[in-house]
Amino acid sequence: MSIYLLCLTTNGGLPVFTRKKGECENLPFSTVASLNGFHMFFKSLGIQLEATTTSKQQPIQNQAPADAEEWTYIWRDRESITLIVCGCGVGSEQLLQTLADLVFGAIGMFITRAAEMAHATLLDRLKKDAKKYVPIVDAILEAACAGTQLLGYTDCLLAAENAQLLQCLNEFSGHCGSLFCCLVVGHRIAVATEGWWDLDTRDRELLLFLLNSSSTMQHDVPVYLPVKSPHIAYRFVSIPVASNSALCVLCGAENASFRELHAHAMSAYRNEGNLLAAAERCVPRSLPEHLEIDGNVLAIILINRHTRKSLFTRNLNQSASVKRIIVGDLQRLDILKKFFDQTMDAVHQFETQSSSNKTTLVDQYSCSDYHKCYAHMDELGNVIFLLFVAAVPSHAMRFLAQRIHANILQEKSVCW
């Protein structure tokens, strides 16, 4: 997988920053200028160039056939800033679209009303504040290429202690006077208030990237929320409550000082050290320790399409014979991620059909010589994706998927 990210000013085409990820070389300036030139040319004709896909044949020495290298290009123009995203081997165009939205959001967290700025002022402001948003952009790119996180969804941790931790969080929320609070454990959200889940998914993701891209878990910074509040800043405060856990709150300037918020956080979680430690032990797996998953399952994705929550993990409970079938955690996660992209694209196509007799996708599966994948959806918008070893009979995958789906969701203590 390779991704280029080019940020330019719309008026002058001057580069603000350039980022790349994967096995790719730096783009020459002439290529950057050509990509921007395509966008400007179509814009002069009143045509908005949004996306295109190209493929080229790479010759292989002493071999007649050649493998096609397919690239997808995305152009986005917003508030005097042009973003060009180029991706190869990314799985789906939707990933690049989501990536572009998040990058614009990262810039918008610190720079507002960019369209009202003069060209020279805008460029100076973008350069000056780059140290604030570029680390977030790098974290977004890392998440897109690593294949261990779903962009467009909030990464969650399902621990058996979540119900008790949520009670402490609601107590803290009442004391600090904010409806927007969450507890982050190991870079994932364990529990959050209803107000936090009411935030747009993009706002939630960006705040999590802001926290996880920093070298410290303690913050008190003003931020704009691209969807909820693009022109009025909130205070984003994060307070460490354990070695790998932080309490996050969105509040206004009139709310309590950081010292008072810190005191409220310590009061709420003073006697909950054992609960936090138990939740942190779930981090590699993201599931309750006592929950047993069939040893023939290699990896799991669980999402809710309405709340945009997600869980993406590998199964650690496997026999030695199973572990030899597919080597490498990233390889098995990448296989399931590709199946996830294909399935969600199919769901989207079914839902956008103009026919009155729409088809609802409930189950889907795929088989290969080395593994099998299965997806199961319920009426509440929960979808589970499983990667099985190839030895599992195809007719048994539906039963196993439904059983694992029920075992996870019937655990009320995880607060899904």
Curated annotation (Swiss-Prot):
Biological process terms in GO annotation: establishment or maintenance of cell polarity; non-motile cilium assembly; vesicle-mediated transport
Main localisation: cytoplasm
Subcellular location: Cytoplasm; Cytoplasm, Cytoskeleton
Pfam families membership: Fuz_longin_1 (PF19036), Fuz_longin_2 (PF19037), Fuz_longin_3 (PF19038)
GO-annotated cellular components: cytoplasm; cytoskeleton; plasma membrane
Highest taxon of the lineage: Eukaryota
Keyword Cytoplasm among record annotations: yes
Function: Plays a role in the organization of cell polarity via a planar cell polarity (PCP) cascade. Involved in the development of the hairs on the wings. Specify the correct orientation of the hair by limiting the site of prehair initiation to the distal vertex of the wing cells. Controls wing cell hair number by maintaining the integrity of the cytoskeletal components that direct hair development.
Protein's UniProt name: Protein fuzzy
